[in-house]
């Protein structure tokens, strides 16, 4: 039996259910899309292209430029009311199943910008699966968030936000 309980060894044969296998495959091949609206996007670039962090070992081989090729979207930065329809359109073009990570204090809660033009958290617009706090969050916190999302996909947990403390 594997550590996550997907595959079972029964006398030299490996057995599993189709649902368990598909959840295992989805959790090991997450294709992220970044939607950077402010300074946290710089930290995402550090994670995606820096030699220090190898995100390929977590199933995210490369960041996608098209929402039609992605199943995970990182929203980073403050979301203005003018940008909300664009984010909704990008989210609707993503493949099912799809997940949302609110990356940073501004995407999670609006940050310090409490005015009429800024949404107070992207969860007012999209169903957020993981909240990564920080200004900006560290790459380690993002890697931890992706690991938590992978665990959720494998266990088929219901939707609802997880706050990552990293």
Swiss-Prot record:
Q: Tell me what this protein is called.
A: NADH-quinone oxidoreductase subunit B 1
Recorded hits in Pfam families, A to Z, give: Oxidored_q6
Note whether Protease occurs among the keywords: no
Q: Which reaction does it catalyse?
A: a quinone + NADH + 5 H(+)(in) = a quinol + NAD(+) + 4 H(+)(out)
Q: Where is the signal peptide?
A: none
Q: Which organism is it from?
A: Symbiobacterium thermophilum (strain DSM 24528 / JCM 14929 / IAM 14863 / T)
Which keywords belong to this entry? 4Fe-4S, Cell membrane, Iron, Iron-sulfur, Membrane, Metal-binding, NAD, Quinone, Translocase, Transport
Q: Cite the binding residues for [4Fe-4S] cluster.
A: 39-40, 106, 135
How does the protein's chain sit in the membrane according to the entry?
A: Peripheral membrane protein
